Amino acid sequence: MKRFRTVHYTIHSEKIKDARGVRFAVIADLHGMEFGPDNQRLLETINKYRPDGILIAGDMIVRNDSESMKKAESLLKRFSAQYPVYYALGNHEYKLYRSNPEENEFAGEYQEYENELREAGVEILHNDFSKLKVGKTGITVYGLEIPLIYYKKPFSPRLHTEEVRELIGEPSEDSLNILLAHSPKYGDTYFDWGADLILSGHYHGGIVRLNRHKGLLSPQLQPFPAFCCGDFHRGSQHMLVSAGAGNHTCEGRLCRLGNGH
């Protein structure tokens, strides 16, 4: 039986205005996997925690795999029937999103996938943002998409802070800023941009993981990646990197944001 693991993080911020805090479920790199029929076990686990929203950090599908799109679509529709869902693309989605449907049959299927999700209420953030309010707390969720050259193996260019600003603008001054950025390779740039909370995946915990935070090699063949897996912080800023769906595992994140008082 395929298994998944739920990891809990509690993060404190003075931007959280309610004593009860805010709770999100975070999923990355599901790649069309199923945990129980129609992902029933995964859905039941999330329902148990009653999050205020679900944040998707990319790669819910496998590129050029119709079945993975069907499975991801079904799950996300079930999520959106109960919770606000915010979805930023990973490299698998982005490749199809940028492809010509006349040249790639899966690109056309992907367009239908996005259309179906939007109709179901899923907010797909193409270098865009969405504002929400939970109690008295204002939150802005940003979805960052970077060109595929930044996923190149083994060498990819540096991503500069000004490039992130060109893609998604400046962080909001009056809300908690959550950045969905699939690749954790550019964590320092995301911190410099000004995110309060960064949510990434992509690395699957590293090809070989040394400990909670350290991996020997990233999927991009980068040795000892700085932000491989787990939780990182810089002052009051935080970054969570999901290990995602590996060999018969899926790591979900339940992230509780508490006030700083």
Predicted regions and their residues:
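Active-site-proximal beta-strand elements of phosphoester/diester hydrolases
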Residues: 21-31, 138-148, 178-181, 238-243
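Solvent-exposed loop/turn segments at secondary-structure junctions
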Residues: 31-32, 60-63, 91-95, 130-132, ...
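Conserved beta-sheet core of the metallophosphoesterase superfamily
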Residues: 178, 183-260
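Binuclear metal-dependent hydrolase catalytic cores centered on His/Asp/Glu-rich metal-binding motifs
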Residues: 97-122, 129, 134-177, 187, ...
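Short, flexible loop segments at the rims of nucleotide/cofactor-binding pockets, characterized by
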Residues: 30-34, 62-65, 153-158, 176-177, ...
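N-terminal membrane-anchoring alpha-helices
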Residues: 1-19
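Membrane-embedded segments
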Residues: 17-123
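Active-site neighborhood of phospho(di)ester-bond hydrolases with catalytic His/Asp-centered motifs
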Residues: 26-28, 53-59, 84-91, 125-128, ...
